[in-house]
From Swiss-Prot:
Official protein name in the record: Hyaluronan mediated motility receptor
Residues carrying covalently attached carbohydrate according to the record: N134, N279, N446, N467, N488, N509, N530, N561, N601
Region ranges (Required for interaction with FAM83D): 365-630
PANTHER family, A to Z: HYALURONAN MEDIATED MOTILITY RECEPTOR
Positions of post-translational Phosphoserine modification: S20
Stretch list, region 5 X 21 AA tandem repeats: 442-546
Protein's organism: Mus musculus
GO terms, molecular function: cargo receptor activity; hyaluronic acid binding
Length: 794
């Protein structure tokens, strides 16, 4: 190699702080370790300082080259990261839209649940009203049963038999009395006929004596008038007796008919008893059904309360999860800020490395001319190295914090995954239990509906029986009306008999007229007539006694007739009461039938509503199950991806920790090498400052120091200069190669850090804020205002 010879002026001109390269000698020693060695002097006691200085130069040059290479790689990585960030933002927006749709569905489900709850409350109110009406109807049934028992007590079989026996005995007595009286009357009539025959004979004999008896006719006529009155009274009594006998016969017929009616009424009462027993059984069945319905309602209320509690717990857990996500997002934002700070620190380090590289270049260009400047720059570099060391320590701390946070986030993700799985299992169990409860309730409801149908059929049969009894009562009333008509006919016949008696009275008057004609003939037989009058007086006495006895008997018969009429009136009243009770029972049965029809209609409507609600709930449950399965699959995929990413991150972190430890060791070695040199430079700087502050003598001292420095560092000849320059170039090339290696390593490290940061962002769902998209987030806009009962927001 040949090097051009520099002019002597350059080496001898004392320009600046340091002498020219040719103005000093270079002496090699065996104890030196670096490529450049210096002779010991009073200020420079250690030989390691030059070597440490050169090592620092190598590091600065390597860092500058590594930063240049890293800039080109970081641009590509930033482009890739921007693409990944955009893709992640799109995915996050899609997920937010899906979440908004799910929230809307949940709100719709809540509104439908509120509607169903309102319907159920209305059904419960209707049921309470029906239960109240049922209670009132049961009270009516109890009152009817009491009235029926009273009627049974009144019309018991023993009482009827006793009354019938008493009436039959009285009728037998009356019959015997009537027969004895008829016999006595027949005997008297025969005696009268015999007497009349005798009188006719006497009349034929006394025709001649009529003239004699005309004078006595006045008295006889008076007596005859009295006798006529008495005979009229007797005829009236006889007619009354005949009427009484006719009435007795009619009463017998009426009694027989009443006995038949009583038997029929007993049968009807038995049928009514059976129907009442059936009604009691039906009421018991209805009570059992109401109890079952109440149990079903309580079960349904319990299920609804459990569903509400579970929904509240789920909503609370969702709120807790959202709060946790918000906290994690805040932590992630803090981590992002820390990363931004670390990136800013790295950029500052890059700038510092660039400055150091520029300073190294200037130092290499002005190596020989500005050694003092080089020392000052070395001081600055050492200070910056301290700052860099501190920043590296901070970056290590940040990396450790990031590792801990990634571990904590991974643990939280595993916990969330476990919680989600447990909640899914609980939801599936809850859905299965809810479906089973719905099926059980449906079966119970079908059973109750079937029992209601049976009850309605039984009530219809009871209604038919009531209709039959009402028809029989109508027939009885018709019979009673026919009997009333017969009674009216008998009264009419009695009026006809009285008319006949009046005609007979007229005939009797005619006979009296004939008797007046015969009075003339009767005068002749006055004596005989006196005898006959005596006999007639006896007969009249007998007739009076008979009249008194017959009057007593007639009074007794009248009393018996009154008692019978009272009994008939009582029976008619009881029949009317029974008819009224039957009418009330018919009205109650009609009301029951109407209520049963209303219940059937309502039950059919409620069955349809329950079927619709169950079908809609089953569809919604299936949709929710499908959505949960899809979400589970998505979460599992995301967790698998996160696990892979965490594994990759752990590998990268292990590599980074290895590299950090390596660089730490290198830095410690450099720091140990630069410590003594730093102390000497500090002492030199202090001396320089003290000398610069002095006037006059300071310049001379500086010149002396410059000369001594030139003597120490000056070359004795050209060969030594060439060797020194060759050594410097070799050291420079070595430093450049080391700087390139360090830059490549730093680029790799930054790439790994960026990749890890992107994976962390993907795992935590955090994206960097784009200022161009400020106030334009469609997913975060509340298009619909929040309701009062919807505290959850997207």
């Amino acid at each position: 190699m040949s090097f051009p010879k520099a002019p002597l002026k350059r080496f001898n001109d004392p320009s600046g702080c340091a002498p020219s390269p040719g103005a000093y000698d270079v002496k090699t020693s065996e104890a030196t370790k670096g490529p450049v060695s210096f002779q010991k002097s009073q200020r420079f006691k250690n030989q390691r300082e030059s070597q440490q200085n050169l090592n620092i130069d190598k590091d600065t040059t390597l860092l500058a080259s590594a930063k240049k290479a890293k800039k080109s790689v970081s641009k590509k990585d930033s482009q890739k990261n921007d693409k990944d960030v955009k893709r992640l933002e799109k995915e996050i927006r899609a997920l937010l839209q899906e979440r908004g749709t799910q929230d809307k569905r949940i709100q719709d489900m809540e509104s439908e649940l509120e509607k169903t709850e309102a319907k159920l409350n209305a059904a419960v109110r209707e049921k309470t009203s029906l239960s109240a009406s049922n209670a009132s109807l049961e009270k009516r049934l109890t009152e009817l049963t009491r009235a029926n028992e009273l009627l049974k007590a009144k019309f018991s079989e023993d009482g009827h038999q006793k009354n019938m026996r008493a009436l039959s005995l009285e009728l037998m007595k009356l019959r015997n009395k009537r027969e004895t009286k008829m016999r006595s009357m027949m005997v008297k009539q025969e005696g009268m006929e015999l007497k009349l025959q005798a009188t006719q004979k006497d009349l034929t004999e006394s025709k001649g004596k009529i003239v004699q008896l005309e004078g006595k006719l006045v008295s006889i006529e008076k007596e005859k008038i009295d006798e006529k009155c008495e005979t009229e009274k007797l005829l009236e009594y006889i007619q009354e007796i005949s009427c009484a006998s006719d009435q007795v016969e009619k009463c017998k017929v009426d009694i027989a008919q009443l006995e038949e009616d009583l038997k029929e009424k007993d049968r009807e009462i038995l049928s009514l008893k059976q129907s009442l027993e059936e009604n009691i059984t039906f009421s018991k069945q209805i009570e059992d059904l109401t109890v079952k319905c109440q149990l079903l309602e309580t079960e349904r209320d319990n299920l609804v309360s459990k569903d509400r509690e579970r929904a509240e717990t789920l909503s609370a857990e969702m709120q807790i999860l959202t709060e946790r996500l918000a906290l994690e997002r805040q932590e992630y934002e803090k981590l992002q800020q820390k990363e931004l700070q670390s990136q800013s620190l790295l950029q500052q380090e890059k700038e510092l490395s660039a400055r150091l590289q520029q300073q190294l270049c200037s130092f290499q260009e002005e190596m020989t001319s500005e050694k003092n400047v080089f020392k000052e720059e070395l001081k600055l570099a050492l200070a910056e190295l301290d700052a860099v060391q501190q920043k590296e320590e901070q970056s290590e701390r940040l990396v450790k914090q990031l590792e801990e946070e990634t571990k904590s986030t991974a643990e939280q993700l595993t916990r969330l995954d476990n919680l989600l799985r447990e909640k899914e299992v609980e939801l599936e169990k809850h859905i299965a239990a809810h479906a089973q409860a719905i099926l059980i309730a449906q079966e119970k409801y079908n059973d109750t509906a079937q029992s209601l149908r049976d009850v309605t059929a039984q009530l219809e049969s009871v209604q038919e029986k009531y209709n039959d009894t009402a028809q029989s009562l109508r027939d009885v009333t018709a019979q009673l009306e026919s009997e009333q008509e017969k009674y009216n006919d008998t009264a009419q016949s009695l009026r006809d008999v009285t008319a006949q008696l009046e005609s007979e009275q007229e005939k009797y008057n005619d006979t009296a007229q004939s008797l007046r004609d015969v009075t003339a003939q009767l005068e002749s037989v006055q004596e005989k007539y006196n005898d006959t009058a005596q006999s007639l007086r006896d007969v009249t006495a007998q007739l009076e006694s008979y009249k008194s006895s017959t009057l007593k008997e007639i009074e007794d018969l009248k009393l018996e007739n009154l008692t019978l009429q009272e009994k008939v009136a009582m029976a008619e009243k009881s029949v009317e009461d029974v008819q009224q009770q039957i009418l009330t029972a018919e009205s109650t049965n009609q009301e029951y039938a109407r209520m049963v029809q209303d219940l059937q209609n309502r039950s059919t409507l409620k069955e349809e509503e329950i079927k619709e609600i169950t079908s809609s709930f089953l569809e919604k449950i299936t949709d929710l199950k499908n959505q949960l399965r899809q979400q589970d699959e998505d979460f599992r995929k995301q967790l698998e991806e996160k696990g892979k990413r965490t594994a990759e991150k752990e590998n990268v972190m292990t590599e980074l920790t290895m590299e950090i430890n390596k660089w730490r060791l290198l830095y410690e070695e450099l720091y140990e090498k630069t410590k003594p040199f730093q102390q000497q430079l500090d002492a030199f700087e202090a001396e320089k400052q003290a000398l610069l502050n002095e006037h006059g003598a300071t310049q001379e001292q500086l010149n002396k120091i410059r000369d001594s420095y030139a003597q120490l560092l000056g070359h004795q000849n050209l060969k030594q200069k060439i060797k020194h320059v060759v050594k410097l170039k070799d050291e420079n090339s070595q430093l450049k190669s080391e700087v390139s290696k360090l830059r490549s390593q730093l680029v790799k490290r930054k790439q790994n850090e960026l990749r890890l940061q992107g994976e962390l962002d993907k795992a935590l769902g955090i994206r960097h804020f784009d200022p161009s998209k400020a106030f334009c987030h469609a997913s975060k806009e509340n298009f619909t205002p929040l309701k009062e009962g919807n505290p959850n927001c997207c």
